[in-house]
Structures are given as C-alpha cells and as structure tokens.
Curated annotation (Swiss-Prot):
Residues 28-91 form the S5 DRBM domain. GO terms for molecular function: rRNA binding; structural constituent of ribosome. Belongs to the universal ribosomal protein uS5 family. This is Small ribosomal subunit protein uS5. Keywords: Ribonucleoprotein, Ribosomal protein, RNA-binding, rRNA-binding. Transmembrane segments: none annotated.
Amino acid sequence: MGGKDIDRLIEERRKQQNIEEILPELQLEERLIYANRTARVTKGGRRFSFSTLVVVGDRKGHVGFGHGKAKEVTLAIAKGIEKAKKNVIRVPIVDGTVPHDVIGTFGATKIIVLPARRGTGVVAGGAAKPVFELAGYTDVLTKIIGSTNPDNVVRAVFDALLQLKTPEQIAEERGLPVEEILRRYRRYALPKMNIKHYYPWRGIYEQT
C-alpha cells in the first residue's frame, strides 16, 4: 500500500466533490509545515533553493496540502500554498471527530486514526496535527508508526482521510437509517476507543 498515488486519489476525489466550483468561496487558513534550504553545486558555485510543505484548510471540512520550490523562501511558500489549494478535498466530520477508525499509509509511515470524545483535543504529533486542525477536527486520537518524515506523515494522513465514509454512506451500506448509525457510533465507538490497545471497531455499526 505504501506505493499508492495519493495525488491521483486526491484529484479523483476533487472531481467527485466538484471542489473547483466552491474553492473561491472557501476561507482557507495556511500552515507552513517546513521550509528547507537545499544547495546545488555548479561550475559557478553553489546555488541555493528552498522547498516547502504547506497545509491549508477552512476548519469546516476542507483541507489540502502542497509543495513549493523556488530560489526565494517567500516564493516557495507561495507556490506551496497555491498547490495546496489545488489539492483541497472535503472530509467528513461527526461531532468534531472522524466518523470511524481508519489506518492511513504512505511509504514507511502508518497512522492510526480513531474517533475521540468531545474535549479530548487533537492528539497528534508532528506534521499530522495541523492537517486535522485545519480540516476542522477538534477531537481525534492518532498514532504514527514508522517514519516520521513530514512528507510521508502528511500523505499518510490524507490516505486516511480519503478512506473516511460519511454516516450517510455507512447507513446506505448497512441498510439502516442515518440516525441509527449515529446512535451506534456514539454508544459503542466513542467510549471504547483506545489508541494503546487498538483494534478495528467498524463492527460497531452491526451492533444493536
């Protein structure tokens, strides 16, 4: 799974969601994850450039990320922001958290994402936290396994977000009313989520 093309998956999701139509209306915040300076040796000496990773989001269910590269750091950041806007997708939020547990992977990085009760906060480290915050999640539990490289982490988070299903989608799959899905979610999922002793809880939607 580590070789998946996250950029292609994002592009497909954007088309499904018609993001381009609403993008100009979104009030997007920006967060710089990193700005690295690199040097290239040429006959004329060393030439420096900057590479950046930026996350944008409206804290209302829309989030994206992008990379920028330029000779000036400000221009590299601007390019990162522009690319991040072109990668914005809509993600489902239920009671401030994710609608179900999910595992995202990219390269040598795996991230476990679990729903959390109100008041828990965004329990995420490194590059993962700003993605969840700018997406609009206020309570979520996460655990990163493997590489903590910011690029891998961000892409692993987006892999997880792309797998999330809305309560409406789950209800349709289960043949149940949305209200019943939410009832089971609040009764069985939230009280039992534990990042230290995690195992998949999607079976909660089959409980009565």
